[in-house]
Amino acid sequence: MAALRALLLLLAVGAQAAIRFAKEPYSQDALHGRSAILRCEVEEPAHVEFEWLQNGLPIQDTEQRFKEGSNLQFAAVDRHRDAGSFQCVARNVQTGEEARTANASFNIKWMETGSVVLKQPASAAEIQPSSTVVLRCHIDGHPRPTWQWFRDGAPLPDGRGTYSVSSKERTLTLRGAGPDDNGLYYCSARPRAVGSVCSQDNFTLNIIDESFPQAVVVPEDLIVTKNEEAMFDCQFAAVPPPTQEWLFEDSPITNRSKTTVFANGSLLITQVKARSTGVYKCIGHGQKGKALVLKATLRLAEIEEMAPFSPKVLTANQGHRVSCACPRGVPTPQVWWERNQERVPTAGRVYQEAEQLVFTSITEADAGIYTCHAANKAGEKKQELSITVATVPKWVEMPKDSQLEESKPGYLHCLSKASLKPTVTWYRNGVSISEDSRFEISENGTLRINNVEVYDGTMYKCVSSTPAGSIEGYARVHVLEKLKFTPPPQPLQCMEFNKEVTVSCSATGREKPTIQWTKTDGSSLPSHVSHRAGILSFHKVSRSDSGNYTCIASNSPQGEIRATVQLVVAVYVTFKLEPEPTTVYQGHTAMFQCQAEGDPVPHIQWKGKDKILDPSKLLPRIQIMPNGSLVIYDVTTEDSGKYTCIAGNSCNIKHREAFLYVVDKPAAEEDEGPSSHTPYKMIQTIGLSVGAAVAYIIIVLGLMFYCKKRRKAKRLKKHPEGEEPEMECLNGGTLLQNGQTTAEIQEEVALTNLGSSSGASKRHSARDKMHFPRSNLQTITTLGRGEFGEVFLAKAKGAEDAEGEALVLVKSLQTRDEQLQLDFRREAEMFGKLNHVNVVRLLGLCREAEPHYMVLEYVDLGDLKQFLRISKSKDESLKPQPLSTKHKVSLCTQVALGMEHLSNGRFVHRDLAARNCLVSAQRQVKVSALSLSKDVYNSEYYHFRQAWIPLRWMPPEAVLEDEFSTKSDVWSFGVLMWEVFTQGEMPYAPLADDEVLAGLKSGKTKLPQPEGCPSRLTKLMQRCWAPSPKDRPSFSELAAALGDSPADSKA
């Protein structure tokens, strides 16, 4: 019984572990040289590995065919390599269970060009007049094409009785062929799906009839100098003998003073001028057949000036090649090199190869003047080239550790020699030193520090370099510190009477100095005064403590220094009467009282509306009284504002502020007489106004506190790590900018179903405008799966207000996750708001049924990643026009412009990469968001903290702290630039995902400089990867920098 239960348990486990395919590969059409994909998915992918077989054998990843996730991706289908059946094998690594899909294969459509060959007779020599000639076209393809024959560029018309065409045999049969059938024969094929091609090596039929004129001597093209004679030889043969004539510019040539036609058919031209040059025709006429025309060209010899050379500096002990551009000339000039009027040999350590001067290993003895000569019948030209050989510098005097005295000039020597004067650069703590008021670098490389300071005591490096290389030396500077006060004591200091006061004195030197205080007059310090470690302490200041005191700092090697301080005993300023806020009627008198006491007696000064009131420049109605009060007569509204009383003596200053409020006198009170200048009603009115203002402020602060607390609770619930939302994110979530929320309530209303009825109606009207009928979509193919669901290509009727069909990208929402649904709506809202040539447009939404669809703009070449990979392919039949540096800069500039528009709209992408940009055949790039993280580009995403993230494109703050911003998009843009210049390579390809994550945490992971990438653009990438987001450039700066970048600058 127990055995039976165990067996049933094993069967149950086996039933649960059964592998079931969700998607299987199916047979399909494919074009040779174009991309394709075979898909394979299981319902439960946990612990399942995938393997692909071709004809039963495992497939190894190559550049053209590789596994992407569980799918088999073909960058370029090959009709030979990819023939046969493919099968997907899914294997559970825990249970060992294995399942296989049915076989699938490609129906590969292709076209291969070929030549036209003679099938009958066996050789061209056997062709006789009136015989049968059969030609065969060697163009083939699948599906089988249709053929057409041509002679001398014209298609052979149907229905002629002199020839027949066989499509089955791909042949052209000429019956009774004669001289009239002579010509160049070729064929073309028109397949059903691939495009038309023409034959490459074609057949020329030339049947000879004795009555037709035949060329015996063919005139040859001639190049002569001016006033030289030219002779064209021409002779024909036929039975009976043919007649012959010469034409120049289609005019017959007769015997004249400068042209002679001889009996044997030759033409002589004497004293050739420019007007004599051109095409000459020798024409033979036979009894039968067409006239035979032979052409020859007469040209004058000429040679242009040579382009001058720039002096060259070549590195010693290395191989070098110097080219001499051949000047244009007729005939083509001969080029050679000379040195010291001797021709450079064609072999040896220094030799000439074609038009190049070659140094196998250049030495200093090879420096000098080399001359490039070019000559033909028209004459000779030459240009001189100065070559300097650069050697690596050698030390004359290396930098040495030095002791420099503070506040005096100091020198560090760096003397070297080389064949070229070395360039000397000094570094301080690894940072290059630029010449300024403190540092000077002399012509021999010596560094002068004009005024040595204590912090100059550090490590210095000198680099001496030439084009051949560099040497470097180090020196540590020890500063001999002078004996000095740090800081020097203030010469006049105040002490508050009857208080405990300390006066400090500190000094430094080569040795720690001893510090003492004495009275300057030599008398001893009072008993209530003590000093210790440079601090002079007065336990209770008395009047007698005023006087001069001297601080003495000394050490044994440097002696002593002194500083005298005058101490003044004073009573600090205090206010007896302070100005108070005052409210008066317009036209009345206002008075601010201000009295202060201290010793010395304080001086009172007033400041009105941030300006000092000078008694000598005041208006007559404004007076400062002897007791310090400020009186303003006949006040106006312009007198309203802040007034400050400033009281000070030689030891301290204090101030107090008060406001003057000027109000209009009520009309009813103006008739009550002088006794009503300060009525109770005015005080009551002011009190009510102030009370209302205070109540308003309290209510606002209370509401702000309540809202902030509510938002914080909501934020903590939504963001467990406490980050604050800020801007819209393309892929969901909200972001932080400067620690403050931005447009939080507005965006919440715009992107959810909450809000007032009027707001809801506006949103519904906008959404109705974006509605797109699901019935107008016709699915073409699935591109892959992302977080939201399946992404596919479709034909859309009436898209973009067009009558015809358009190719569109459709993203489906197939998830029940509320956060992902919100992210889907946010993405649609974002693309609906953006309108830029380098950003894809939202064309419509399908929401009348599930799943919801987002219909986006699509372009013909697909995503930028695949485009870059194909452009790097070694298969010449696949590769489009090669990508130059100019093209790569253009691609990056367009992405920067699109992202500039996106960031200006306060959006953040969060997944910017080449895979998420689209490119057209015209190489126009558009920022999109395919995000095929589930299959096609699964290897470019990493599962981290319950989410799939593009780890290799993200900055540390986004990965580790979940802080996304425009500056995190800038980091991703730098990686995208790296992808463009490596043509689709994976960032950090040698590293596993865990190693990349560890590198981001430590800050040590760096992407290498792409091969052939200009240094200026490499520095721009490095700016994008600055550790601190605030140090990264904006997209506007990036677009401007790329727009100004010289496309062909050297790396």
From Swiss-Prot:
Keywords: Cell adhesion, Disulfide bond, Glycoprotein, Immunoglobulin domain, Membrane, Receptor, Repeat, Signal, Transmembrane, Transmembrane helix, Wnt signaling pathway. Residues 707-1051 are cytoplasmic. Its main location: membrane. The protein kinase domain is predicted to be catalytically inactive. It is a single-pass type I membrane protein. It comes from the Eukaryota. SMART domains: IG, IGc2, TyrKc. The lineage of its organism: Eukaryota, Metazoa, Chordata, Craniata, Vertebrata. Inactive tyrosine kinase involved in Wnt signaling. pathway. CDD domains: Ig, Ig2_PTK7, PTK_CCK4. InterPro entries: Cell_Adh-Cytoskel_Orgn, Ig-like_dom, Ig-like_dom_sf, Ig-like_fold, Ig_I-set, Ig_sub, Ig_sub2, Kinase-like_dom_sf. One of its GO terms (molecular function) is protein tyrosine kinase activity. The keyword Transferase does not apply. Residues 23-105, 115-204, 213-298, 308-388, 393-472, 487-566, 573-661 form the Ig-like C2-type domain. GO terms for cellular component: axon; cell-cell junction; neuronal cell body; plasma membrane. Disulfide bonds join 40-88, 137-187, 234-282, 326-372, 414-462, 505-551, 594-645. Expressed in bone marrow, spleen, bursa, thymus and brain. Weakly expressed in fibroblasts. Also expressed in embryonic liver. Residues 1-22 form the signal peptide. The chain crosses the membrane at residues 686-706. GO terms for biological process: homophilic cell adhesion via plasma membrane adhesion molecules; regulation of canonical Wnt signaling pathway; synapse organization; Wnt signaling pathway. It is found in: Membrane. Residues 23-685 are extracellular. Belongs to the protein kinase superfamily. Tyr protein kinase family. Insulin receptor subfamily. This is Inactive tyrosine-protein kinase 7.
